[in-house]
């Protein structure tokens, strides 16, 4: 009965996900651009407390009223976290935004911080209180289990990460258009080689635009045929040579590989 209720809830949630009140501006701007405010309403800012202040460290995606999806490498057991929702500019008070404490963190059991290229860079955060959905706070859709996007499929990475290698940290949410690089290409020796696994998804690699420091844990947003946006990736890692390095696309945890894990964690917690 509990499982039936959960599945019903997930299905009901899926009917009202990935469809922003304020649709994003989908352009081909090279180098990224400021996002339309609240056009990625599942995007969250994961923040940690230090000396009485809160600091942005990673992105994440709201996938249920009480659950946020992020990267395992964003999590440190010694830190206290909260999640900022409905945000655009992280440094001004914004109407309709929320800050909610994290009550539980579930990191994938096979994640190893010393071997990031082995994958499983995924974590779920349970919020201390479920959030009410508004025009500025909405749920992300997740793709069907096992979905593989074709080469050159257009997606958008979003976050408050650095604008370029060693560059400035933006106040407002940024978006960048990235084309998916298929596994055969991304795992070739001229690209990422054996560092990339089938449980990952690559996007970018043109030497111009990519995810960067501070984007980690955030979504790779890809539009489905029905017009809804699905989070296909979680920002995982990039090249030590720089954020925008040629033939070193951003590497994401492939969400469709972990749908069963996500549902299991939510069902049991």
From Swiss-Prot:
Superkingdom of source: Eukaryota
Alphabetical list of Gene3D superfamilies matching this protein: Trypsin-like serine proteases
Pfam family membership, one: Trypsin
Localisation per UniProt entry: Secreted
GO molecular function list: endopeptidase activity; serine hydrolase activity; serine-type endopeptidase activity
Active site: 73 (charge relay system), 121 (charge relay system), 216 (charge relay system)
Assembly, per entry: Interacts with CPA1. Interacts with SERPINA1.
Disease: Abdominal obesity-metabolic syndrome 4: A form of abdominal obesity-metabolic syndrome, a disorder characterized by abdominal obesity, high triglycerides, low levels of high density lipoprotein cholesterol, high blood pressure, and elevated fasting glucose levels. AOMS4 is an autosomal dominant disease. Patients manifest obesity, hypertension, early-onset coronary artery disease and type 2 diabetes.
Protein name: Chymotrypsin-like elastase family member 2A
Organism: Homo sapiens (Human)
